């Protein structure tokens, strides 16, 4: 039986953290960008250990859905409302990618603003709504969820999706291997 997006995300995050064992996950500390992910405090710019942390309570896309009169795909919402985390680098069958994540509440608000801009652009171009969640190693290509179907697609910014990569976000994440920087 296929895992849900929540279970698949848990599995990938666990393997990501496990893959970093030894050297650990490091990030430059920023006192003006607080996050539950920081394992310690330090002077701004110093490297500190971090780890993905479960959101409690989970964040919500209700304001985006209300503003655009559009129901966002449930898997997409779950993907961004499960963990606080730095972006997660991964290897997919098609190449390297970076899974976008939210580091704190302010980062989530920025994601929502960018998503609204993306959806309004899609509307202006008379294209079906897609929801971005990742970057690729090819400039101008992003990973998106097709809102209507939940399929994961490769999309050039400003264009309709060109290639279906997986039937669902959970199926896509299942194919990934962690790449810790």
Curated annotation (Swiss-Prot):
Which Gene3D superfamilies does the record associate with it?
A: Syd protein
Main localisation: membrane
Record flagged with keyword DNA damage: no
- InterPro entries in the record: Syd, Syd_sf
Q: Which UniProt keywords apply?
A: Cell inner membrane, Cell membrane, Membrane
Cellular component GO terms, alphabetical: cytoplasmic side of plasma membrane
Query: Where can this protein be found?
Result: Cell inner membrane
Record membrane topology:
Peripheral membrane protein
The protein's job, in short, is: Interacts with the SecY protein in vivo. May bind preferentially to an uncomplexed state of SecY, thus functioning either as a chelating agent for excess SecY in the cell or as a regulatory factor that negatively controls the translocase function.
Query: Which family is it part of?
Result: Belongs to the Syd family.
Protein name listed in UniProt = Protein Syd
Q: Which organism is it from?
A: Alteromonas mediterranea (strain DSM 17117 / CIP 110805 / LMG 28347 / Deep ecotype)
Q: Where is the organism placed in the taxonomic lineage, from the top? A: Bacteria, Pseudomonadati, Pseudomonadota, Gammaproteobacteria, Alteromonadales
